[in-house]
């Protein structure tokens, strides 16, 4: 829960900084891409964002969340697989560790084909603001951040 609040604080601060830089007077919507590997508690993140936006340029903003599926590639056999293929094999404490520190995936996840722990994360980690829509000088503007 604390993790989601910290992420919400970072998102709000970043959007406010971008809005100030781009002279946005009111933010209408923020699109947030969330990597599946983060395993975010979306309800907690939404509650935190809605609480933190009060009294700011984000007060009327709608937050739109897009989940990016995590995908890996084995460096040993070049197999490509998805997080959903191996998540069921993780213990609860292992999944929680990956939630807080996604880099720990290399400790707990192995290639389902050859068993190697040597893989790269192709996509689906981290959180990024993918778009901000707001009002500048009375007219709506769209900003792909």
Residue ranges of each PLM-predicted region?
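N-terminal, polar/charged subdomain of small-to-medium soluble alpha/beta proteins
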Residues: 1-29, 36-145
